[in-house]
């Protein structure tokens, strides 16, 4: 059993063979590109797998959704990874850095993902239809993210921000957020902003 498969089972993250194959291929692509382009700090498959599990863990509690906008996708965390896991949902990946955009396009092609659109822009310069879910990982403060995402938010839009332990200082309890802890991560979720 592969290390990734073992972790998916350990953390009760749903997967099938196609998802596992794509995640393993993504890991190889990221490590290959990372040597030349420094896309992320992950230097080996174990470190990439940590990012994969971090990206996928919310599948344990997220309600179903049809569309997602991921702000600051970077090398694919969490948007591209969630797109691999949820092929029936559409993902708009928003990333302004050209080398990361090139990598994302390459991954979409190599992995045969038809549910992904990549936007090589900053969120402030983008016009999109309001998605069901907005995600972001390690981009900026919660209030700044909400301000940047405001044009994309409709009454049906939920948010999932991948935050660190300091998230409690960024929000008020009465704002209706659910915080789910996992290792050093705090998943900040609010259904129907």
UniProtKB/Swiss-Prot annotation:
It catalyses: guanosine(527) in 16S rRNA + S-adenosyl-L-methionine = N(7)-methylguanosine(527) in 16S rRNA + S-adenosyl-L-homocysteine. It comes from the Bacteria. GO terms for molecular function: rRNA (guanine-N7-)-methyltransferase activity. Keywords: Cytoplasm, Methyltransferase, rRNA processing, S-adenosyl-L-methionine, Transferase. Its EC number is 2.1.1.170. NCBIfam families: rsmG_gidB (TIGR00138). Belongs to the methyltransferase superfamily. RNA methyltransferase RsmG family. This is Ribosomal RNA small subunit methyltransferase G. It comes from Wolinella succinogenes (strain ATCC 29543 / DSM 1740 / CCUG 13145 / JCM 31913 / LMG 7466 / NCTC 11488 / FDC 602W) (Vibrio succinogenes).
């Amino acid at each position: 059993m592969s290390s990734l498969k073992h972790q998916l089972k350990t953390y009760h993250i749903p997967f099938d063979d196609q998802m596992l194959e794509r995640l393993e291929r993504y890991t190889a692509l990221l490590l290959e590109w990372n040597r030349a382009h420094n896309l992320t700090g992950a230097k080996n498959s174990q470190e990439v797998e940590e990012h994969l599990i971090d990206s996928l863990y919310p599948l344990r509690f997220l309600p179903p959704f049809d569309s997602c906008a991921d702000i600051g996708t970077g090398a694919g965390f969490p948007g591209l990874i969630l797109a691999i896991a949820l092929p029936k949902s559409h993902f708009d990946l928003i990333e302004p850095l050209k080398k990361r955009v090139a990598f994302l396009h390459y991954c979409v092609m190599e992995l045969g993902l038809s549910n992904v659109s990549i936007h090589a822009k900053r969120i402030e310069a983008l016009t999109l239809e309001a998605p069901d879910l907005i995600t972001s990982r390690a981009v900026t403060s919660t209030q700044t993210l909400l301000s940047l995402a405001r044009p994309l938010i409709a009454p049906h839009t939920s948010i999932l921000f991948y935050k660190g332990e300091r998230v409690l200082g960024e929000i008020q309890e009465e704002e209706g957020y659910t915080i789910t802890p996992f290792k050093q991560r705090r998943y900040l979720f609010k259904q129907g902003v």
